[in-house]
Amino acid sequence: MNDLARRHFVRAGLAAGALSVVPPFARAQQATLKVVWMGWPDNQVLPLMAEFEKRNPSIKLAVERMPFTQLFQALEVRLNGRTSDPDIFIVDSPLTASYAARGHLMELDPLIDKSRFSAGALAAGQFNGKIYSAPFGSSMQVLYYNKAMFKAAGIEPPAPDLAKRWTWEQLVDAGRKMAKPAENIWGFTFEQQERPYQLLPLGQSLGGKALSDDGLKATGFIDGPAFVEAFTFMQKMYTEWKISPPGQFDTALTPELFGSGKCAMLLGGTFINDTLKSKFQNLDFGIAPHPYFAKGKPVTPTGAWHFGVNPRSPQKAATAQFVRDMLSDDMNVAWFKLRPYVPTVKAVWQREAAMFNSDLWRIAQAELDSTALPRPATPGFREYEDILRVALRDMQAGGSVAQALTGAAQKMDRELAKYK
C-alpha cells in the first residue's frame, strides 16, 4: 500500500467507524446541509430536494447548483481547503478514486445495502474495495439506427436482442454501404468521439486492460496489443473506410448528425432517446445492443453521477440520513422520472416495469447486469483521461496508433507517479 493510500485509510477508518454507529436522524434535531449539485434545470432538481425536506422536516438543504464547465474546478478549490463545506457533493463516478485517495470522501459501506444495487454501479463508486460514492444513476450505450437508410440500402438492421448483437465487423460492412463522405452522409458515428468512456470498451472487448489494478501504471496496459488493434480498427473508420465523420468532438453535434438523417448509425447514451423523439419527430429509428469484436467479448461502458459525503462534515447523522433516503426505492423512482438516467437500484426496474417496457430499457438493464464495465479506478483519472483524449484525436487523424498509445502511456505514468 502506498503512503497516500495508507494515510487515507487511517482517516477513512476513523470516519467509517463514526458512521457505523450513526443513529437515524432524530426529528428533534435541526440541521442544514450544504449541498453542491450539478446545474441541471430547476424541474429536475428542486422537486427531488423538496421531497427530501418533506420526508425529513428537521433537515434543510442549502443547494448550490453549478454548471458542468465550472463544477470540477470549483469543487477542487473547496475540497482542497479541507473544511466542512460542502457537506454533500455530486461526484462524477470515475473521479471517486481521486477524491477518496485525497481524503475528500467518507466511506459509505455502513450505510449501503450492496444487494440492492447493480454490480456495475457499485464498482463505479468503489476505491480499494470500499464504497466512497453513492450510486445515484448509471449510464449505458446503445446502437441507434436509421430505419429508412437501412431500407434504402437493402440491409437487414440489427436486432434488439443481446444474443444477436452485431460485431464491429458487421457494423463497418453495413456502414460502408450507406456512407457517402463526399455528400456528408456517414455510416456510423460515436456520440463521444474522443472520450475514454466511449472508446475503452473497444480494447476491452479484445481482452485489454486499461490500467493496472492499483490504478497507477499505464505502460503495458493502455498501450498493449488489444488496444493497439482496437484503436487501429477505430482509426480506419475515419481514414480508410470513411464511414465516420472526422473531427466531430462536440457531443451535441453527433446526435444532430444522426437525427437529421446524415448518419445511419449512432452509438450513444440512453438519454439521447428522448432528445431524438422530441427534436426529430419524423425520424424513424431503431435500437440495438452495443457492438463487440467477433473474436472478443461484449463490453459496455457505464458510470454516471454519484454523490458523496465530505468526511469533515460535523453533521454525521444528517448526512447519513441524506444517503439513506436518497438511495431509497421511492427517491430513485422519483429521480428517474425527473431525469432518466439508468437506474442503479434493482427494485426500480421491477416497481416501474411499465416504464421500462421498451427495447431501449430492456437492453440497458440486461447490459448493466452482464457487460457493463466502469472506467478504471485511479486517483489520477483526470490526468489519465486528458492524455488519452489527445491521443485518440491524433489516432483518428491518421497518426501512428502504436506510437500515440506508447507516448500516452508514458505521460500517464509520469502523472500517476505522484500518487504513489
Question: What do the PLM-derived regions correspond to, one by one?
Answer:
Residues T32-P47, M66, S139-M140, P376-G380:
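Extracytoplasmic "Venus flytrap"
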Residues Y132-F136, Q141, T167-T219, A226, ...:
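Extracytoplasmic/periplasmic solute-binding protein
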Residues Q29, Q281, A288, F336-V390, ...:
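Long, aromatic- and glycine/proline-rich binding clefts that accommodate carbohydrate-like moieties
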Residues E51-A119, I131-S133, A148-G154, P158, ...:
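Extracytoplasmic "Venus flytrap"/periplasmic binding protein-like
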